[in-house]
UniProtKB/Swiss-Prot annotation:
Belongs to the SSU72 phosphatase family. Pfam families: Ssu72. This is RNA polymerase II subunit A C-terminal domain phosphatase SSU72. It comes from Candida glabrata (strain ATCC 2001 / BCRC 20586 / JCM 3761 / NBRC 0622 / NRRL Y-65 / CBS 138). The gene is SSU72. The keyword Hydrolase applies. GO terms for molecular function: protein tyrosine phosphatase activity; RNA polymerase II CTD heptapeptide repeat S5 phosphatase activity.
């Protein structure tokens, strides 16, 4: 089996719309198996006024959100990039998914801000580690706008490639990958000082 297909990646942000979905797209196009989630209580997107965001339950299809924003103001939401974002999202999967309701297991989870990292780690701890399967949770602090989502997504792909290469190397040499991950993260962080990184091993 292709090593890229053997590893299972996951990307997580608050609403499963911008940062996690751009990273989802980039990893998927690179040939990786990837899923994505949000950790917020609901999907929140900018509204026509600052104090009135658009709020949707997780599971609301991206296409429905797209059409709702289109009916509110095509001009406004095209200008701020939301319609283009949702168009990308609906090509990747049906709807935003909530991390806490997910049942899949992953080898690596990339979160896009510290509160999402904390939510994922807390949820995994609450699940109790019954499978005794390690999962590497890595936070990369990405600002929540279109341009930074693209920069962060490319940086996550670079890290995924480094991790993939090392996992393959460790399997061939019969060495323990867990002994190598901090060195990989340190090397990656040196190349991306503008994207602060956190790491925590956890268990399913």
């Amino acid at each position: 089996m292709d090593q890229k297909q053997a590893l299972k990646f996951c990307t997580v942000c608050a609403s499963n719309n911008n940062r996690s979905m751009e990273s989802h797209r980039i990893l998927q196009e690179a040939g990786y198996e990837v899923s994505s989630y949000g950790t917020g209580s609901a999907v929140r997107l900018p509204g026509l006024s600052f104090d009135k965001p658009n709020v949707y339950p997780f599971g609301t299809p991206y296409n429905d959100i797209y059409n709702d924003l289109l009916s509110q103001s095509a001009e406004r939401y095209k200008a701020n990039g939301l319609l283009q974002m949702l168009d990308r999202n609906r090509r990747l999967k049906k709807a935003p998914e909530k991390w806490q309701e997910g049942t899949k297991t992953f080898d690596f989870v990339f979160t896009c801000e510290e509160r999402c990292f904390d939510a994922v780690c807390e949820d995994l701890m609450n699940r109790g580690g019954r499978l005794n399967k390690i999962v590497h949770v890595i936070n990369i602090d990405i600002r929540d706008d279109n341009e930074n989502a693209k920069i962060g997504g490319r940086a996550i792909l670079e890290l995924a490639n480094m991790l993939n290469e090392k996992v393959s190397e460790c399997e061939q040499n019969d060495t323990l990958f867990e002994d190598c991950i901090l060195d990989i993260l340190t090397k990656w962080q040196e190349a991306h000082p503008q994207l602060p990184c956190l790491y925590a091993p956890s268990y399913y």
